[in-house]
Design a protein with these regions (language model features):
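Selective transmembrane alpha-helices of multi-pass membrane proteins
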Residues: 65-95, 161-165, 175-205
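Hydrophobic alpha-helical transmembrane segments in multi-pass integral membrane proteins
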Residues: 53-57, 121-126, 193-205
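Membrane helix-loop-helix hairpins that form the core translocation module of multi-pass transporters
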Residues: 36-111, 168
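Alpha-helical membrane-protein architecture signal
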Residues: 6, 10, 105-117, 145-149, ...
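Juxtamembrane transmembrane-helix termini in multi-pass membrane transport proteins
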Residues: 2-72, 131-150
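Hydrophobic alpha-helical transmembrane segments of multi-pass membrane transport proteins
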Residues: 147-170
Length: 205
């Protein structure tokens, strides 16, 4: 049992350290919107992991893996959502540091929700959990309990790595949170979102 957990932890660590959509969202949010909003985005991403864990534990993930229609619907919704995020970043008007750092700045963006939806609307995450987690559930053990245990390990690692990224980004934000730099960063992040949207739209199970 210990060996199983150690093997899963190693695999989860490699997955966590691999740069992707979550990394881009956390870095951009932490630099342009501040440490607090960076943590909100990270918590949303982790909440999305728990939602997928619950879906897999309840057996609904098998439906996603078996049904092409269900997979395609979630895939296109996820791709459309990423494109919407990209458009929002492109149209965003960056503010200078002295304005962006004040408490009077309107807080209209729910970064927790954005992080969560970005994860939940990615069917690849569901397929990954469906195909990956069962390999580490010992025979005769409760699938529900072990699914949430494994997801919790993944989330803890994700939280630790997100904390490192957020702190690095927050320290650099004083130099990077300038209108032109934020605009450039928004466009780069938007480009990353568009690439992931295209990859998702063209993907198959």
């Amino acid at each position: 049992m210990i060996a199983t957990l150690l093997t899963f932890s190693l695999a989860a660590m490699l997955l966590t350290l691999t740069p992707g959509l979550d990394t881009a969202l956390i870095l951009r949010t932490s630099i342009a919107e501040g440490r607090k909003n960076g943590f909100k985005a990270a918590l949303g991403i982790n909440a999305g992991c728990f939602i997928w864990g619950a879906i897999v534990a309840l057996g609904l993930g098998a439906l996603l893996a078996a049904s092409q229609v269900a997979y395609d619907c979630l895939k296109w919704i996820g791709a459309a959502y990423l494109l919407w995020l990209a458009i929002q970043l492109i149209l965003a008007r960056p503010q200078p540091l002295d304005i962006a750092s004040t408490s009077n700045q309107p807080k209209t963006t729910n970064w927790f929700l954005r992080g969560c939806l970005g994860n939940v609307l990615n069917p690849k995450m569901g397929i990954f959990y469906v195909s990956f987690l069962p390999q580490f559930i010992p025979v005769g053990q409760s699938p529900v309990m072990w699914t949430f245990l494994l997801v919790s390990i993944h989330v803890v690692m994700g939280t630790l790595w997100s904390t490192v990224l957020i702190n690095i980004a927050a320290k650099a934000s004083g130099y990077l949170r300038q209108p032109k730099i934020i605009q450039w960063m928004n466009r780069v992040t938007a480009g990353v979102f568009v690439l992931f949207a295209a990859k998702l739209a063209l993907s198959s199970r």
